[in-house]
A protein has these predicted regions:
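Active-site neighborhoods and metal-handling regions in enzymes and metal-associated proteins
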Residues: 1-599
Length: 599
């Protein structure tokens, strides 16, 4: 079926491209800081192709259009692109060109590539420069072509900013600035242009609300050896925040003056920029008069290693969150088939359980609740107008989390609602085995997630199946649910950043199996890397679990598990009962005892 709305928007865009002398135009769902999740104001790619996933790049040319996205979104993209005339390019699949390869192969000598340089990372802009220079292709990065077409575009975000008390943050702004400057100096820089929103919030101990579920405020910072300048919308600051920033000797300037400020800097500074998050526009501005030190934001690693205050609060919050999820599972299992429950109303009930926790602030991302085959779409999002009704059969996958004054949670459970096939039971059992194997990793300091990923992936690979995405990501502290530089993947991909696991780093553990048209299974816990024995061989490490939610007993068939996997699973279930049961009523407690095989 044709999607006339999208086709008409693309026609208007092509007309605008012709007027501006642009042959190929590129759009991402990205903001001026290359954030993963963005305010609705920045959803230009979605506006022009209907794809709502968090990762994807749309390229439009005279007689065609293509969307590049990763394995998490293949199924979703197929459905959302139907009838739009936009072709799906499945990234990292055999025979599929990268965006750079496609542009190199399809753009002609002397043509023009256009994009809004404020939403393209400098890293990507530089790649396009290099690929296209041999054909003398011009890059036009000064214009947002959507501006005149998207007439009902949402307002630019400017939500209220708040201060995060040092008792909750665990470190003062002064301590964080000192650590940042030390790392900056080691990189040979005398200044830092910081553009990554969660790094900015962490550094200044502030939080915002400019991105749904991400407590960040639109901002930049310019840090020197002596000063710190914060560029932020001053209408978002109340008197308390203004006084707080002044008390910590942080100069405040208006958000949209950053380009003029950088242009006016004396020439010759050695400025550290992280090209993954610095926009192409800011990069080109600095390139004219400054020496650019291209490296990683020093704040990223500092933020990723949680301090003792953060870790203590996280343990408390994850326990409360685990209780809420466990209560939700009990409610769902005892009410399905007795009253109408949809994917959306189930998610709403879980949100309500979280809202009962005093420290609750917001969700950490929109809840993913996928029933039966919908669960095969890793980032499926049901809507009131388009959602499945749950029946006492099959399974419901629920991936959810909360923002609390004390931590950010992320947990997935796949819940049995009634009869399931032997194949599904086998798949579920092996996903549970995968989670347990990674949970019990024991390694020498120096490993990255790529070294450990096989522990989770092996039970699934043994069935000749793969889940086509990473196994884990870092989680912020009252910040973004996806955080780096630590991650867990099985292979290296272009532009990928890796980090050695440090004591205090958190990571998700979320293997899965996704069978299109049938079912999806994911189990996800959050863990913290901790130092273990240190001896003549080096520093050994292990993971400590933060998430304590039962793994569904009805979906486990122990004939597929070896003795070690059984032992790990029984230990986890036993600990779940010990930690969660004190917060349950008698009916819930009795159910949990059976669910975890304690009685």
């Amino acid at each position: 079926m044709e999607n006339k709305v999208i086709q008409d928007r693309l026609a208007l865009l092509r007309k605008k491209m012709q007027e501006e002398g642009i042959d190929f135009y590129m759009m991402l769902t990205a903001d001026f800081h290359n954030s993963e999740y963005v305010n609705d104001y920045f959803k230009v790619r979605e506006y022009f192709c209907n794809f709502t996933g968090s990762n994807g790049t749309l390229v439009v040319w005279k007689d065609g259009a293509g969307l590049w996205t990763d394995g998490r979104y293949f199924i979703q993209a197929e459905a959302e692109l139907e009838g739009t005339t936009v072709e799906l390019f499945r990234m990292l699949q055999e025979g599929v060109p990268t965006i750079e390869e496609f542009l190199e192969q399809n753009m002609q000598q002397g043509q023009t590539l256009g994009f809004d340089g404020r939403v393209i990372a400098a890293m990507d802009g530089k790649k396009y420069e290099k690929v296209l220079e041999k054909k003398q292709i011009r890059i036009a990065y000064e214009k947002d072509l959507a501006e005149s077409i998207w007439t009902d575009r949402p307002d630019f975000p400017a939500g209220k900013v708040t201060v995060l008390d040092e008792k909750i943050a665990g470190k003062s702004v002064e301590e964080k600035l000192t650590e940042t400057r030390e790392k900056m100096a080691k990189d040979g820089a005398n200044a830092l242009l910081l553009t990554k929103l969660d790094d900015l919030m962490w550094l200044f101990n502030i939080r915002g609300c400019d991105v749904e579920c991400n407590p960040v405020a639109m901002s930049y910072a310019y840090i020197t050896e002596e000063s710190a300048t914060l560029f932020i919308q001053q209408k978002a600051l109340d008197a308390q925040v203004t006084e707080y920033l002044a008390a910590h000797r942080i100069e405040v300037k208006e958000y949209d003056t950053v380009v003029d400020f950088l242009k006016a800097l004396p020439a010759g500074n050695a400025i550290l920029v992280d090209n993954r998050y610095c926009s192409y526009t800011l990069y080109k501005t600095l390139q004219k008069n400054q020496k650019l030190v291209e490296g990683k934001n020093p704040t990223e690693l500092l933020k990723a290693i949680k301090n003792p205050v953060e870790l203590a609060r996280m343990q408390e919050i994850f326990l409360k969150d685990s209780v809420a999820v466990t209560k939700f599972i009990y409610w769902l299992k005892t009410h399905v088939g007795k009253e109408k429950i949809t994917e959306v109303t189930a998610a709403d009930y879980l949100e309500q359980k979280r809202r009962e926790i005093p420290e609750f602030l917001d969700l950490s991302f929109p809840t993913i609740a996928g029933y039966k085959s919908n669960a095969a779409m890793m980032h499926y999002e049901a809507t009131p107008d388009n959602c499945a009704t749950l029946e006492p059969e099959g399974m419901l996958l629920v991936d959810s989390g909360g923002q609390y004054l004390g931590g950010t949670t992320d947990v997935t459970r796949t819940i049995v609602l009634g009869p399931i096939s032997e194949e599904i039971k086998k798949h579920y059992t092996m996903v549970a085995a995968a989670v347990m194997q990674l949970t019990h990793a024991h390694w020498l300091y120096g490993c990255t997630g790529r070294n450990l990923d096989i522990l989770a992936r092996q039970p699934i690979w043994d069935m000749d199946i793969d889940y086509q995405c990473g196994t884990g990501h870092g989680v912020g502290y009252i910040l973004n649910v996806h955080e780096g530089p630590q991650n867990m993947r099985w292979r290296f991909t272009g532009g990928m950043v890796e980090a050695v696991f440090e004591d205090g780093m958190d990571i998700t553990n979320e293997p899965g199996i996704y069978i299109q048209g049938s079912h999806g299974i994911r189990i996800e816990n959050v863990m913290v890397a901790k130092n273990d024995v240190k001896n003549e061989y080096g520093q050994f490490m292990h993971f400590e679990t933060l998430t304590w939610v039962p793994i569904d007993r009805e979906a486990i068939d122990e004939k597929y598990l070896n003795d070690t996997q059984k032992k790990y699973l029984h230990e986890y279930q036993k600990t779940v009962y010990e930690k969660i049961s004190p917060y349950l009523n008698e009916e819930e407690k009795e159910w949990l005892a059976k669910e975890t095989r304690v009685k």
